[in-house]
Amino acid sequence: MPTINQLVRKERKKVIVKSKSPALKECPQRRGVCTRVYTTTPKKPNSALRKVAKVRLTSGFEVISYIGGEGHNLQEHSIVLVRGGRVKDLPGVKYHIVRGALDTAGVAKRTVSRSKYGAKRPKDAKK
């Protein structure tokens, strides 16, 4: 615990919080163009083919984004909306593509957690 005199001589350092998604430049989402759509494998205990896309953002950054949900319609030159949020078992993937926005279609036949996957409410859905 510093004395008052020590604080007068040298003030406390401000804590600088580093952004976990710097490519978004303090925005909630950013628009971008897919430059490459491919699959990659996760880290050690897990095994799968995860769908990812390399996206050139309007902020000038080129980032790797995860495509959530089952099936997608993305290809090169698709316009997508990118949000923050990393994928724990994919190194270097710190962004997600928003489903149901711009060129990205929502997940077909999705009945639960629909808002996260851009799926409309089915006609035969009962409350």
UniProtKB/Swiss-Prot annotation:
GO molecular function annotation: rRNA binding; structural constituent of ribosome; tRNA binding
PROSITE patterns: RIBOSOMAL_S12
PANTHER family in the cross-refs: 30S RIBOSOMAL PROTEIN S12 FAMILY MEMBER
Subunit structure: Part of the 30S ribosomal subunit. Contacts proteins S8 and S17. May interact with IF1 in the 30S initiation complex.
Species of origin: Campylobacter fetus subsp. fetus (strain 82-40)
GO term, biological process aspect, one: translation
Keywords of this entry: Methylation, Ribonucleoprotein, Ribosomal protein, RNA-binding, rRNA-binding, tRNA-binding
InterPro entries for this protein: NA-bd_OB-fold, Ribosomal_uS12, Ribosomal_uS12_bac
A Pfam entry, by short name: Ribosom_S12_S23
Protein name per its UniProtKB record: Small ribosomal subunit protein uS12
Keyword rRNA-binding: yes
Domain of life: Bacteria
Family: Belongs to the universal ribosomal protein uS12 family.
Protein's job: With S4 and S5 plays an important role in translational accuracy.
Gene Ontology cellular-component annotations: small ribosomal subunit
3-methylthioaspartic acid: modified positions: D89
